[in-house]
A protein has these predicted regions:
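Conserved binding-pocket/active-site segment within a compact domain
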Residues: 118-224
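An acidic, glycine-rich, mixed-charge low-complexity segment common to nucleic-acid enzymes
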Residues: 1-153, 157-158, 226, 230-238
Length: 238
């Protein structure tokens, strides 16, 4: 059986090698960096923190979470170790997947993280929001849902698996006290949903440019430049 937990951890490990640099526009141009270089966040990003058992994946602090992540990469903890957890396939209240006509599960979150690098690489097809949980006003077809997530930004990327589905990446800012630096964000929660989680939020930023930079070598590749932004940069060089 394919070990989707290992695949997710391996993808997360690959993503940690890069810094995704977004140039955003609304009223002014904003530049932010998105990093996933904190390995202890893996258990939260893919939902393992919500599993009450088995004990092998229980982690209550950063050191324990790093240890769990390392053991997954070493295949000392595999998906077979958690597949019988009653929480793994329990429906997440308020979510809805039009493809399966049912709510999402923690297992669905793990499967999504297998695709994390691809999602980030094509995130220019999505939108970036400043997130305010107090403005969350999510209404599904059959229930109301309040998203109580303490994030600073929300990156929303259309799914390639289902035209109704979006990939939601919640990000927190680690350098709020450094006003002279570009905003630095870290991914700490991610999941898919066909319910619109952006209702009530302010208008999104336009993604003007997306660059992927390898942290160790500083090599970078521009994944996308908005035509209008490209033109403005060309005019600035004249």
């Amino acid at each position: 059986m394919e070990d989707i937990l290992y695949n997710a951890a391996l993808t997360f490990s690959n993503v940690m090698k890069y810094d995704y640099i977004y140039t955003l526009g609304r009223k002014t141009v904003l530049k932010i960096s998105v990093l996933s270089n904190r390995s202890y966040l893996f258990t939260h990003v893919c939902g393992l923190d919500h599993l009450k058992e088995p004990p092998v994946i229980t982690a209550n602090n950063e050191a324990q979470k790093k240890k769990v992540y390392k053991k997954i990469l070493q295949k000392k903890i595999t998906f077979s170790d958690i597949q019988d957890s009653p929480d793994l396939n329990e429906f997440i209240k308020g979510t809805y997947n039009t493809a399966s006509d049912s709510p999402y599960t923690i297992k669905d979150r793990i499967i999504m993280i297998e695709e994390l690098e691809c999602i980030l690489d094509r995130s220019f097809t999505g939108k970036m929001y400043r997130w305010d949980k107090n403005k969350s006003s999510v209404t599904a077809a059959y229930t109301q849902r309040y998203i109580n997530i303490n994030a600073d930004f929300l990156l929303v990327v259309p799914s390639e698996r289902n035209p109704d589905e979006k990939n939601y990446l919640f990000l927190y800012q680690s350098n709020k006290n450094n006003k002279n630096e570009d905003i630095c964000l870290h991914l700490f929660s991610a999941f898919s949903d066909c319910v619109d989680l952006t209702l009530g939020q302010e208008a999104p930023y336009t993604i003007l440019e997306l660059t992927k930079r390898e942290i160790e070598t500083k090599d970078e590749i521009t994944l996308f430049t908005h035509p209008a932004y490209s033109k403005s940069k060309d005019l600035a060089l004249v």
